[in-house]
Amino acid sequence: MAVQQNKKSRSKRGMRRSHDALSTAQLSVDATSGELHLRHNVTADGFYRGKKVINK
């Protein structure tokens, strides 16, 4: 089993963990239907960037 050779300080531990925070979901309003959707994702109606890409 791997064992560290020298103890890492609280500062180094904190610096390593500084990138682990979660961010909120980025939402956009669809131009055609006006509904909220995730950025860079198709809406529930099948629109992406103002164009119909999925036919139901």
UniProtKB/Swiss-Prot annotation:
Instruction: State if Ribonucleoprotein is listed as a keyword.
Output: yes
SUPFAM superfamilies, per the entry: Zn-binding ribosomal proteins (SSF57829)
Q: Name one GO biological process term.
A: translation
A molecular function (GO) term:
structural constituent of ribosome
Q: Name one GO cellular component term.
A: large ribosomal subunit
Ranges of Basic residues compositional bias? 7-16
Q: Where is this region: Disordered?
A: 1-26
This protein's UniProt keywords: Ribonucleoprotein, Ribosomal protein
Name the InterPro entries for this protein.
Ribosomal_bL32, Ribosomal_bL32_bact, Ribosomal_zn-bd
One Pfam family, please name it: Ribosomal_L32p
For the keyword Ion transport, the answer is no
Q: Belongs to which family?
A: Belongs to the bacterial ribosomal protein bL32 family.
Q: What NCBIfam families does this protein's entry cite?
A: rpmF_bact
Name of the protein in question: Large ribosomal subunit protein bL32
The organism encoding this protein is Shewanella denitrificans (strain OS217 / ATCC BAA-1090 / DSM 15013)
